[in-house]
Amino acid sequence: MEAAFRYRMATRLARRLREAGRPLPLPALGEALGLRGPVERVVRPLLDGRFLLEEGVGLWEWRYPFPLEGEAVVVLDLETTGLAPGLDEVIEVGLLRLEGGRRLPFQSLVRPSRPPSPFVERLTGIPREALEEAPSLEEVLEKAYPLLADATLVIHNAAFDLGFLRPALEGLGYRLENPVVDSLRLARRGLPGLRRYGLDALSEVLELPRRTCHRALEDVERTLAVVHEVYYMLTSGRPRTLWE
């Protein structure tokens, strides 16, 4: 069975259990895949680390949360005018702090020194007029930085975003010393065998809603959805912090 298809079917089973809010027997899960009759040979191989097998099939996420109690996680994404730190600029910052069952979102457009290209406007859906009225990167980071305190950062393809973020924070006199988890690398561990590990490819495999444009907070939510699935695949009933 192709890896992408297997992960897609397993995620449908996890979604069915979340809808039910309780453990279900294998035949009921088979129905979620459109199967009838004996289904164990098909369903059981799909049950990865997310699933708890007792009386029926449940989910480990019902036993322990992500992130764990006492752990703070910040999922972060930047939108930029291009791929080259030092030449290109940040035009949007989005992040979501998760701690103690609370969600603290932050999003802001950023005014660049020169307008983005028409390609970037189409890609992000951010009109240059909106950027002209946005605060500077320094102003945005002064507001965002306190939300990073004592948190593990989760960033998809982290080296790219950090190439913009670290120099900007250092220019303000801040050092970014948080532990960083690259969700792209995490996905490679939890979802081996895929051809691509970009957010679009992972979202397709996990059947997340398609994005209409590249916006920071939308990509933060998609990254979080991917990491949530992969975290339980990898921990499989052995709770630990994301950084571990």
Summary of predicted features, one role per range:
Residues R22-L33:
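Short acidic, hydrophobic short linear motifs in intrinsically disordered regions
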Residues R12-A20:
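Short amphipathic alpha-helical elements of helix-turn-helix/winged-helix folds
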Residues N178-R188:
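A short, structured active-site edge motif that brings together acidic residues
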Residues M1-M9, R36-G70:
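Charged low-complexity interaction tracts in eukaryotic proteins
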Residues T80-G82, R185, R222:
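Short, glycine/acidic-enriched loop or turn micro-motifs at the edges of active sites
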Residues E2-R8, R12, L24, W60-E61, ...:
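Acidic two-metal-ion nuclease catalytic site recognized across multiple nuclease folds
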Residues E61-R63, E69-R166, E170-N178, P192-R196, ...:
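Conserved non-catalytic scaffold segment of RNase H-like nuclease domains
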Residues R215-H228:
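Acidic, divalent-metal-coordinating active-site segment for phosphoryl/phosphodiester hydrolysis
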